[in-house]
Amino acid sequence: TTQLLINLYRAGDTKYFHALKVWDRYSSQMFLPHALDGEAFLPLFQSGDAARAVSLSQKSPLRAGAESIAPWEAVYRKLTQFYEDDAVPLSARPEIMSLKQELARMILGTHPEFLDLAETYFTQEDLFAIRNRIIGTGRIGGKAAGMLLARSILKREMGESEYTRIMEEHDSFYIGSDVFFTFLVRNNLFRLKMQLSRGAQISREEYEEVENRFLEGHFPHDILDQFQNMLEYFGQAPIIVRSSSMLEDSFGNAFAGKYRSEFCCNQGSPEERLQAFLRAVKLVYASALNLDALSYRRKRGLSDRDEQMALLVQRVSGMQYQRYFFPPLAGVAFSHNLYAWTNRIDPSRGMIRLVFGLGTRAVDRTGGDYPRLIAISHPELRPETGAKVVKYSQREVDLLDLDRNDLVTLHAADILAGRDYPNQHLYVSLMKDGCLIDPSSPFLDGEAEECVLTFNNLIRQTGLVKIIGRMLEILARAYGRPIDTEFTAFIHPGGRVSVNLLQCRPMTLPGLASLQVSLPSNIPRERVLFRSSRIVNGGVVSHIQYVIYIDPQRYHDAPVPVKKSLGRIIGLINAHPRIQQGKVLMMGPGRWGSSNIEQGVNVHYADINNTSILVEIAREESGHLPEVSYGSHFFLDLVEDEIIYLPLFPNDPRAEFNEAYFQQTPNQLAGLVPEAAEYDGLIKIIDAHQDGRMIQVFADPKTQQAVCFLE
């Protein structure tokens, strides 16, 4: 047995040391790459530095197994022979081009628009580099392909020098889609997948049993060996296992947030790290059969498509601070801004949803917590002013606790309390004597009462917004349509910005947003149910039969177990055949889809996907506040399904909220869904047909006004 295996190498003028195997010893930094600084080897904690160093140590981190006779291996070997031959005849060029196209199809997929872009922007060297990091065989899936294509586009259009200066290495591996298929067959899960994909219904409780069956599964020894090779390469650097299915992030189907991603802190002995990684892989595989993913596929007529799951395994972008690992900046960025809260903003320039720490808080809908929304055309403008800047700021941070070996959420104030986090003056403003002040130097005032994450100095003093804006412009031009991205960013000493582009996909715009919608005038006041402002997407929905109404005050007073179960009950109602056949208006307190049940109803995509209008009722006395959450996976679901989102402020006289109609109209819940009868006082189903009426909604995205009334 090898007791000590060390990789020593030089890159440029720097010498590196990386322990791959150490028998019967362990420390928290033992398996990190180290760089020689003077007479000492120092660990590389920043992800970009580590990725750059380790990627130079070997051409292919995965040790070769037995030679495969798979067709794509034959194509790869033939193309490699041509590439390494210095005297390729001119007559061979058509064959080389055909082989390159075939290898791209075998690795990346078959979508014509994507392959056209791949033909333009991927070189043979790019395809070889991808091939050298594929575990098993098969395609790498939509998420991985989209990320790699976006990087190739930026590299070509920016030029090598600018690209290298700005972009952080992504340092990724790809678990081929054939590994998923093999895992299903080997562990008697294939029939289950076919049954669920083709229409069998499953509850969230039953899905837990599906997860358990996946967790009991096993991989072939050759795949386990490659997993081990990859983990030796990463050492103790945190990694993330991300879904990358064949249909994910494709043209027309985003699958935003439908599948799972799992962080691995990657601490402990090699065997402990392997077991944690295997658990993460199995959980992501199981998410191919979760209720939201199945509902999404059915709604888009994709149930009969063979949705194979590849995986994208990436080094987590960030750096260690105390016992935690996280990026200082993360977010989502869109080349088109659907949420222009003032007419000064140019929607075509795009927008950013920015957070401190892991980007999970940028894409998930969290209670009582708000990212910074940045309109790229006017980055210093905010939707909020005055005291509301503090109220609508980020208060919690997601990060990896290396001691606990787990993903945790902490108060931002606790992380920033020491006032010594690098570049903290760029991220926070200081509350002093009731006023919010932007730091004038890197040395923060120790007498300030509170640090508030505003990112004001970051926006003014660095080139981050300009860099993101340029990236979005280049990518949207290459794609020929709006795009959305996920990223992390790091500010180096001296202010230089580096960005790690983690994801890129075509962006879905609401089909009705560009229509001219004129709100009807002279509607008798007794027929108006409510008026709404600050809307994002618009359109006209006529002949609405059902209203699913959750009373805000009764929700506020409901016990916690009832609030926790409410999402499941809404899902039952949503799945009822009569609800599916009619047009539906859903109304409830605070933020639908929030992870915090005190802030709103904790529903998932499959619980609301049959609605036409979603209304968030904001009663500040109950602590319920709507939030557009532009850029979150929840919001992208609304846009993609053309569900009109309307915030309602009953205390605003202009809202004309006819609360009496919703309280006094008879409740059809018990008759329609008898198993939900005990929720009769909290949930109301109104059938407008009972009075021979229908409900109609007009929403004008240009004036950001909407009206709902009885026809």
What are these language model-derived features?
Residues 2-39:
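Phosphate-binding/switch region of NTP-binding enzymes
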Residues 25-64:
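C-terminal regions of RecA-like/P-loop NTPase motor modules
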Residues 114-117, 121-161, 217-619, 671-672, ...:
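Conserved mixed alpha/beta core segments that line enzyme active sites in large multi-domain catalysts
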Residues 621-663:
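C-terminal regions of proteins
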Residues 189-213:
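N-terminal leader/propeptide and maturation segments of large enzyme subunits in energy/redox metabolism
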Residues 57-104:
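Eukaryotic intrinsically disordered, low-complexity, charge-rich
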Residues 98-121:
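An acidic intrinsically disordered interaction segment
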